[in-house]
């Protein structure tokens, strides 16, 4: 990492764009193309965290006016000397400034190379580097706060504490076995078991944070289901804020699964408006109904829409039991009309799907109650986005491997096997946790993380 890299660090088309340099010659390269209005402000002599206004030139050719900010190693994003040109945001202007700094001695940065350098220079951990991806992809307040929590080191600290406990247990076992003549405290199986159980509880919680984390980051896969003409499409259009589904009084109008991603409060829903669940002789509608059933099987959340202004139909009585044991909210629609569902019918529905709300999709009422009901059934009512949360498949794989090895160690200890055998399992668990943090991650694993980055990050 002795060379100096450069890249456009902002999306094109904005009013302001940035060209970023990082490396040992970043300030010198910047000085070759920058003409400050105040001649005393040379990039190489400016204090860190300061800026200067001037012109960017390629030889004698003026390219743009810009503000140059400088940061001195190790107090920068990458841990290296960094220079940032804030120019006008036109694509051609930025490309010309980038070409000028490359001609002056920098080389084009690779995808994710700035953050990779931050990792290699100890400015961030691997989990913190992964959080940068999540910040860029955040779709709502919760996902942004979760990503920022990871960037602040919430997951890294909790995983490292668990790994340290396991390493300490291994060291104690090794010292007691290998140096019996020394004054080493005897390993107490009950005390050791208590420590291991606490670590296992931590890993179990982290492993189960995966599903919540996915719902927060990627959105809740949601199927809107119900019989024909109960208001599913009206609800879809209300949630999406535009007409995505055809709304008529004719049953079977929606013949396929219509998908949309919407924000509902601080939640993101990946909605699927399904064809009405009913018997039909229309072969096209039959295909739509079959796709609806598949969407029902694969979703995280079911919004089951019923028409409160009429009694249950035989078809509804047939599919409602499928909600049992699922994360489902029963939506009694058309509350603006006289109710026709009986107390007995609502009681039978509550027996299979206890959470329900009454709304009028046509009038747009009841959304606040629906939002809270969704949080309740998917387990996000008390979700803390700043807590340690598993963010991706790599992290989940490490946690699962660690928990599996730890469970084997606990079972070996309880079964009275040798402490050597227990220690081997604990070492494997600790190794998996340290792989998660990046301390023992292979170059290939790190490469896969940075494959997800774009140039300039």
Task: Describe the function of each predicted region.
Residues 285-309:
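Inter-motif core of Ras-like GTPase G domains
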Residues 14-16, 49-51, 298-302, 325-328, ...:
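Short glycine-/polar-rich loops that comprise or flank the Walker A/P-loop
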Residues 107, 268-270, 355:
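Conserved beta-strand segments of alpha/beta enzyme cores
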Residues 1-145, 149, 153, 329-330:
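A glycine-rich (often HGG/GG-containing) alpha/beta subdomain
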Residues 21-22, 87-89, 239, 274, ...:
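Glycine-rich, N-terminal phosphate-binding loop of Rossmann-like dinucleotide-binding domains
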Residues 2-11, 141-263, 280-282, 294, ...:
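C-terminal-of-GTPase-core extension/linker across diverse P-loop GTPases
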Residues 52-72, 252-280, 296-301, 305:
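Switch I (G2) and immediately adjacent beta-strands of P-loop GTPase domains
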